Amino acid sequence: DKQDLAEVWCAVQVAELEKEEEGVVNFQSNIPNIGFVCNPSYNTAIKWDEKKYPNLLPGCETQDMGNEDEWDDPEENLKSESNARQHFVSLLNYLSNQKKFLAMMEKDNSNYTTKELKEMVSYIKKNGIKVYGFTTIADKETLLKLSKQSEVYEIYTEEVR
């Protein structure tokens, strides 16, 4: 069943996870908190270098943003691991070339330097996309249905007012 979820942001594993003594993965390690929206909705015309950043914005693969009939379905595209991988790699490459973004992140001592973003790209190209969590906004009934799916290990909620 398709769930009624608002935009879903997926957290992607971009480096090897540290394991504790019993081989249990330590999700509190210093893995960068980075990912992508897997059901995007775009309402503006954006242009980018499609050769340099293929599939940067799924569903908006044409430069002619005025013709909605030519847009791909972003949710369908991102169901394919190869499309999701290409999209995420393009996002990381795009970020690694944004000098203002990198300067801002550097001041915050983040994991988002050009070198670290390129290392993330290498990891994704070698290991593929591994989503380890996601965030969304949904009502109680939707989350209860979602919690019954076998792929869902745990749900953490906060009330939004």
Regions found by a protein language model. Name each.
Residues 1-130, 134, 157-161:
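Loop-rich non-cytosolic ectodomains and luminal regions
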Residues 136-143:
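Helix N-cap motif at beta-to-alpha junctions
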Residues 143-158:
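Short acidic amphipathic segments
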